[in-house]
Design a protein with these regions (language model features):
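Long, low-complexity, charged/polar intrinsically disordered regions in eukaryotic proteins
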Residues: 3-53
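Short helix-coil-helix linker/hinge
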Residues: 58-65
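Short acidic, hydrophobic short linear motifs in intrinsically disordered regions
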Residues: 74-86
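Short amphipathic alpha-helical interaction segments
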Residues: 86-102
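Ferredoxin-like iron-sulfur electron-transfer modules
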Residues: 88, 119-121, 272-279, 283, ...
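A short, conserved structural fragment
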Residues: 101-112, 335-336
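Short, amphipathic alpha-helical interaction segments positioned at domain boundaries
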Residues: 114-156
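Catalytic cores of enzyme domains
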Residues: 155-312
Length: 343
């Protein structure tokens, strides 16, 4: 697979608005959120040409950046807690937090004993890079967000992919199979099954746009897929994508199954998010190998653990006629065709 995005000239990824003054709060926030090890350790300086800067600048005021800097990354805080740490007026602060959520800088959920709404500053990927691309209003006004998503799905992983253990360790995505293609006597663990997750989040689903497909279109790459409705948000994330302009709409379990069937008919890959342990996800994606950044990154760096399944491809040699169809269709490159032999 030739991932064209990797061959773009460096000028494609510089600050699209060099005429604007550099904003210190944005630099600080970009450094706090980024997963890029050289920047975290101080070996590389974050500048206005860094995607962490020019990806945040269009969607975040200096005041909002200072609010986010007090939150910490992936540390949920209720509105009352935010009032305490910022000292801001509650109504004004709530207005800012809701705007930050609409723009995709923040997400929110109700995952606490009191079931009280809490705001979260997410990672770039998975996180704000996807959310900004899902929001058509933001993406139309700031098409550079498409390139921002591409950069942040690759740059942080360039140095660490060889160290990713089986299962991904919370990095990348986790492939789940089309259940009807798996022998039901197989000792598959339940988290591998779409049905497990649909039952776990019963009644809380929202179909939303694919951020990878939308991102690619901003720089004229990808495929001809309609980006709408391929990402199935579950749980509190379903409310988030519906309420914050991310193109989400609530669907039934039957409608979700119809989307998965349509994805299977198109040869797409079911993937679940992989950052919150084995018993929590926030979405089931239906990924096209031609545009999916998670699949791209795992194959580009030869790190299949990043998009690993609990299943292993095996060939029944006596039945194989070396037609090559399985090689053509497998998005993870799990089988190869040699001299009339499959491995």
């Amino acid at each position: 697979i030739r991932w064209k995005g990797q061959f773009m000239g460096k000028e494609e990824f510089k600050n699209p608005h060099p005429e604007l003054p550099v904003r210190e709060p944005i630099l600080k926030l970009g450094k706090m959120i980024t997963d890029r090890v050289p920047i975290k350790l101080g070996f590389e300086k974050l500048t206005a040409d860094s995607p962490e800067y020019w990806g945040l600048a269009p969607i975040c005021t200096d005041e909002q950046a200072n609010i986010a800097l007090k939150m910490g990354v992936r540390k949920p805080k209720t509105l009352k807690q935010m009032v305490q740490i910022t000292g801001m007026d509650e109504k004004e602060l709530e207005k800012q937090l809701e705007q930050m959520s609409f723009n995709g800088l923040l997400e929110y959920n109700w995952e606490n004993p009191q079931h009280e709404k809490q705001y979260v500053l997410p990672m770039f990927v998975p996180g704000s890079a996807e959310f900004t691309n899902m929001n058509s209003t933001v993406l139309e006004e700031h098409p550079e967000m498409g390139r921002f998503f591409e950069r942040m799905s690759r740059l942080p992983l360039e140095k660490i992919t060889p160290m990713v253990p089986p299962g991904g360790a919370g990095i990348g995505m986790h492939v789940i199979p089309v259940e009807k293609a798996i022998d039901m006597n197989n000792e598959a663990i339940s988290l591998e099954k779409i049905s497990y997750w649909l039952d776990k989040y019963d009644g809380k689903y929202a179909a939303s746009p694919c951020s990878c497909r939308k991102s690619r279109k901003t720089y004229d790459e990808g495929c001809a897929d309609d980006p709408e409705d391929w990402c199935i948000a579950v749980g509190d994330m379903a409310d988030y994508v519906v309420e914050t302009g991310k193109g989400g709409h609530y669907i039934t379990k039957e409608e979700a199954l119809e989307i998965f069937k349509k994805a299977e008919d198109n040869g797409f890959v079911h993937q679940i998010t992989n950052i919150d342990g084995q018993d929590k996800i926030f979405a089931i994606c239906n990924c096209n190998v031609n545009v999916c950044y998670a699949l791209r990154t795992s194959q580009l760096f030869n790190t299949p653990n990043m998009s690993r399944s609990a299943y292993v491809a095996k060939v029944t040699k006596e039945n194989c006629v070396a037609c090559g169809k399985c090689v053509e269709y497998c998005p993870a490159g799990a089988v190869k065709l040699g001299q009339k032999l499959f491995t």
